[in-house]
């Protein structure tokens, strides 16, 4: 079971990214599980359940699990991931997924996952938050395995310089991959999938399903 942690600020598009990736990999025959973290409600889990289980019928109901963690979002994924680790055991027992996406509650650029919880981490930024963010750094941006800059279709409306964001991402991440996408228009999503396939070794692990 490969565990992919997805984190980033509130509203950056983490849940939408998970829905896109779950659909993409489920259609290849890879069994996908989803574990969400919310501070005060299971809103994201309910949204994913409605979209992927009830409406599109991509996932069985037992493949989606939501946690209400309370307190600081990063505590449950870094300092004390025990609640998430138990939830992963439950998810594995009832769904036996090949690939699990774990969504953190919305947090800041210093958020990271415990290595005991996630094998690979994706940090999601929102273009409309401003082109300064990649250059500001923070361990979420600099140390994640993949940086996803989402909502690039909004760049002209918020006067965000995508070239500056690309240059800053390359500089602060010291060569680790970044990808610029719009989940709304689909721009950049094929490159995102290519990077994930390669970084996660999906073809090696799952054979033809990983292609």
Curated annotation (Swiss-Prot):
- A GO CC term attached to the entry: cytoplasm
Q: Which UniProt keywords apply?
A: Chaperone, Cytoplasm, GTP-binding, Nickel insertion, Nucleotide-binding
A Pfam family reported for this protein in Swiss-Prot or TrEMBL: cobW
Q: Where in the cell is it found?
A: Cytoplasm
- Recorded family membership: Belongs to the SIMIBI class G3E GTPase family. UreG subfamily.
Q: How does it assemble?
A: Homodimer. UreD, UreF and UreG form a complex that acts as a GTP-hydrolysis-dependent molecular chaperone, activating the urease apoprotein by helping to assemble the nickel containing metallocenter of UreC. The UreE protein probably delivers the nickel.
Name of protein: Urease accessory protein UreG
Q: Which organism is it from?
A: Metallosphaera sedula (strain ATCC 51363 / DSM 5348 / JCM 9185 / NBRC 15509 / TH2)
């Amino acid at each position: 079971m490969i565990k992919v942690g997805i984190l980033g600020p509130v509203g950056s598009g983490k849940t939408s990214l998970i829905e896109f990736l779950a659909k993409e990999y489920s259609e290849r025959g890879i069994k996908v599980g989803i574990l969400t973290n919310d501070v005060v409600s299971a809103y994201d889990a309910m949204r994913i359940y409605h979209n992927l289980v009830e409406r599109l019928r991509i996932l069985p109901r037992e493949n989606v699990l939501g946690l209400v963690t309370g307190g600081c979002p990063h505590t449950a994924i870094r300092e004390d991931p025990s609640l998430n680790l138990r939830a992963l055991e439950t998810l594995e027992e009832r769904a036996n997924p090949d690939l699990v996406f774990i969504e953190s509650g919305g947090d800041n650029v210093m958020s990271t996952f415990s290595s005991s919880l996630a094998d690979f981490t994706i940090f999601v930024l929102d273009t409309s938050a401003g082109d300064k963010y990649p250059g500001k750094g923070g361990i979420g941006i600099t140390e994640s395995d993949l940086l996803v800059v989402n909502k690039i279709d909004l760049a002209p409306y918020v006067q965000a310089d995508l070239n500056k964001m690309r240059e800053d991402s390359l500089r602060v991440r010291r060569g680790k991959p970044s990808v610029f996408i719009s989940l709304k228009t689909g721009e950049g999503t094929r490159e995102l999938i290519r990077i994930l396939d390669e970084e996660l070794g999906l073809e090696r692990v799952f054979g033809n399903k990983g292609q």
